[in-house]
């Protein structure tokens, strides 16, 4: 197989150029890549086409690059199928199917959401005991205490900063 490459704008001209060189078994045009893949039935015709395309340009003057690539990149000559590793035979045919219908009389129940409680019960009780208690231990470092005032003149909660 030969791969002809030019700019994507000149792919149609490249395809016509490839068709005129020698009889082609089939071609594939890759517009976005600016490539034409051409396959030939005869190796001698393929080699002749490679020599003819060495001029390096289309009739419009656009550069053309031609490369020879193997038709089957996985084929290695000299190794038969008997010498290569074979896929093992299937012992069982595994069938993955959806689950069956629910049993007769089954009714769906409404379940509680998974995170209905944010904290464990014992931790929540201890926090409720603390309430708005102010810890007066100033030796532990700086503290920030936020509390609400019942004063109607102040609309935002006051903040106490202690050092």
From Swiss-Prot:
Q: PANTHER family under this entry?
A: CALCIPRESSIN (PTHR10300), PROTEIN SARAH (PTHR10300:SF14)
Q: What is the lineage of its organism?
A: Eukaryota, Fungi, Dikarya, Ascomycota, Taphrinomycotina
GO terms (BP aspect) = calcium-mediated signaling
What superkingdom does the record give? Eukaryota
Family membership = Belongs to the RCAN family.
Annotated region (Disordered), positions in chain: 142-163
Function of the protein:
Inhibits calcineurin-dependent transcriptional responses by binding to the catalytic domain of calcineurin.
Q: Matching InterPro entries, A to Z?
A: Calcipressin
Q: What protein does this entry describe? A: Uncharacterized protein C13G6.15c
């Amino acid at each position: 197989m030969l791969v002809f490459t030019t700019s994507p704008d000149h792919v149609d001209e490249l395809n016509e150029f490839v068709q005129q060189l020698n009889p082609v078994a089939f071609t594939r045009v890759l517009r976005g890549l600016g490539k034409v893949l051409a396959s030939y039935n005869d190796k001698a015709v393929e080699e002749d086409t490679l020599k003819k395309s060495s001029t390096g340009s289309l009739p419009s003057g656009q550069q053309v690059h031609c490369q020879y690539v193997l038709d089957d990149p996985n084929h290695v000559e000299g190794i038969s199928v008997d010498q290569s590793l074979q896929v093992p035979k299937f012992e069982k045919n595994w069938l993955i199917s959806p689950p069956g219908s629910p049993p007769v009389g089954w009714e769906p129940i409404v379940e509680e959401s998974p995170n209905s409680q944010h904290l464990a019960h014992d931790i929540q009780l201890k926090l409720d005991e603390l309430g708005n208690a102010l810890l007066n231990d100033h030796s532990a470092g700086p503290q920030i205490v936020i509390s609400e005032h019942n004063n109607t003149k102040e609309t935002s909660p006051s903040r106490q900063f202690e050092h």
